[in-house]
């Protein structure tokens, strides 16, 4: 009888690698939350601290990474894997000063945030992440996190659905023109209300939004014209116009209205100038004298006559036989001689 075959199991009894832990969890059907622990460099030398951590967090669903190695790009994190990322600062915050410079690096946030699941949380062990540190808070917000009561949370953006919008068709006349309505519709007799349509019940827990009433765009209703006379009441019309300070006349200067005057000063000044001009034109109208108001002006000098005793000094020569006829009046003391019936002055 041949000897029975002997099978040797070569798998390790204790394997704490992350790949083995993930495979074991999937084999067991474990769907628990995954946690990432981010530790400062000095915590690697404290074995008791690491042991106490893994006594609290399940090693099969917890990963440990060093912040300095993550900042140097020596390790990478899987995307959308962790439900909780915990920064180890000790419960009393004794390692806070060691962690803060590393969390001020934007490259670390660019690697940590994508590793969070939607709705995942990022916080520190002492609960002071982003509290009183504007640099950490700014970097967390710029990375897309939202500050909450239990640290920073990655928003869970649900899948967006496209909702088609249907607009009501405009009414068109027979000739192809669109009717316009500039007034309110006349009140028509109320039509009997239609019977309400049966409402179909949807699945439990699912809500439906009816946009038919909100988006019922009627072109005729939107074309109503507002009467601008109804915008002001009687009290508004009787209220005095408030004159701006820049329109008030300055000492020693004439009032001048602005180019775009809206307070009424330009119209008031134009009316005053027109009234002043009409008054001046009325006062400077043409003076009309009557016949009794007119008198002949005599420029002759009485008592100073010529040799003919007909013309006075300053008088024109009018006698038909006068040798000086047609000549201007002589000046006082001027001597006139006649030569060949021609006056020699």
Swiss-Prot record:
GO biological process: iron-sulfur cluster assembly
Function: Component of the cytosolic iron-sulfur (Fe-S) protein assembly (CIA) machinery required for the maturation of extramitochondrial Fe-S proteins. Part of an electron transfer chain functioning in an early step of cytosolic Fe-S biogenesis, facilitating the de novo assembly of a [4Fe-4S] cluster on the scaffold complex CFD1-NBP35. Electrons are transferred to DRE2 from NADPH via the FAD- and FMN-containing protein TAH18.
Protein name: Fe-S cluster assembly protein DRE2
Region ranges (Linker): 164-237
Short sequence motif named Cx2C motif 2, residue ranges: 319-322
Main location: cytoplasm
Subunit structure, interactors included: Monomer. Interacts with TAH18. Interacts with MIA40.
Cofactor(s) recorded in Swiss-Prot or TrEMBL: [2Fe-2S] cluster; [4Fe-4S] cluster
Keywords of this entry: 2Fe-2S, 4Fe-4S, Cytoplasm, Iron, Iron-sulfur, Metal-binding, Mitochondrion
Annotated source species: Podospora anserina (strain S / ATCC MYA-4624 / DSM 980 / FGSC 10383)
Family indicated by similarity: Belongs to the anamorsin family.
A molecular-function term among this protein's GO annotations: 2 iron, 2 sulfur cluster binding
